Amino acid sequence: MQKDASLSGFLPSFQHFATQAIHVGQEPEQWNSRAVVLPISLATTFKQDFPGQSSGFEYSRSGNPTRNCLEKAVAALDGAKHSLAFASGLAATITITHLLKAGDEIICMDEVYGGTNRYFRRVASEFGLKISFVDCSKTKLLEAAITPQTKLVWIETPTNPTLKLADIGACAQIVHKRGDIILVVDNTFMSAYFQRPLALGADICMCSATKYMNGHSDVVMGLVSVNSDDLNSRLRFLQNSLGAVPSPFDCYLCCRGLKTLQVRMEKHFKNGMAVARFLETNPRVEKVVYPGLPSHPQHELAKRQCSGCPGMVSFYIKGALQHAKAFLKNLKLFTLAESLGGYESLAELPAIMTHASVPEKDRATLGINDTLIRLSVGLEDEQDLLEDLDRALKAAHP
């Protein structure tokens, strides 16, 4: 699919993406039946030829044929050597964190998904890990924050929900001045289609596949991709030891979702841009935040490290909390719900929904106030989306 001329200026799409999404790890020749659709292997245990001699699978937690196919496909799409699937995005986060030991320090982007913030702040810190929250979009702050105890840097780009970007390459240069710090990039918002963190210098690319990678709001899953054989070996040991693996059925569904990732993301980009432009010219809107708009302070960075933008659009409605609630109440096509990245359009109020667990003082500093609304723009007809937003804005501000 060719990008609309008005959406140009970003990196070119990654070569062979759709072909790899459809075929890698799913070759019919690997099945006796020659099935062209990935079979679902529900078996929990597998017959061994001799005691202690398996044919590649022993117990489904340790390895499953359907999960293996998904992991091969994701590795290809992330431009990675290895990929691992987990039961959720947070399960992936927890497993990565187990690479560390008590006394180590994590530097985390100051603005991240609320669940990530909660896990680092209230759970990981209880196990002897030091957590520092830093605005990694400012590389000087990142460099100043690194201590001898720093072992992992966690960045999210774009951030959730204010869509702030971090320069992955610049962060990697700073982090890798020391040979013992792991750089993790949460790629949930961009997906493998629009951004490849490993190619930009990250050590680990992770995402919540619940969102764009699966894209149908019917799977909870996390994905982790790496190029390092050592990191892959350590993470696979933890994947098996901690046991937070997805079901074979969910792996099948995610594989199916990947096959349409390219066409979905192109449509999300088109619709997201249309919504952002509409909101930016609306008198009832205070400010729009979308990396695809020239008005975004890091628009040029987005064009340098991404091949496009997803359907995530955040904006500040004029007025106060009552106006934000009125707007959300009067939406008909957009569904009031958490999560994102599905084919259906969603709207939410981060301050009291997805980011309610973030301390109020931190929310205020980050700009997550009572008038910030986050949209996950879906695949519906563009005009229908714009009319729904226009109607709800007029209802909030008669």
UniProtKB/Swiss-Prot annotation:
The keyword Cytoplasm applies. Belongs to the trans-sulfuration enzymes family. It comes from the Eukaryota. Catalyzes the last step in the trans-sulfuration pathway from L-methionine to L-cysteine in a pyridoxal-5'-phosphate (PLP)-dependent manner, which consists on cleaving the L,L-cystathionine molecule into L-cysteine, ammonia and 2-oxobutanoate. Part of the L-cysteine derived from the trans-sulfuration pathway is utilized for biosynthesis of the ubiquitous antioxidant glutathione. Besides its role in the conversion of L-cystathionine into L-cysteine, it utilizes L-cysteine and L-homocysteine as substrates (at much lower rates than L,L-cystathionine) to produce hydrogen sulfide (H2S). Substrate binds at residues 61, 113, 118, 338. InterPro entries: Cys/Met-Metab_PyrdxlP-dep_enz, Cys_met_metab_PP, PyrdxlP-dep_Trfase, PyrdxlP-dep_Trfase_major, PyrdxlP-dep_Trfase_small. This is Cystathionine gamma-lyase. Keywords: Amino-acid biosynthesis, Calmodulin-binding, Cysteine biosynthesis, Cytoplasm, Lipid metabolism, Lyase, Pyridoxal phosphate. Homotetramer. Interacts with CALM in a calcium-dependent manner.
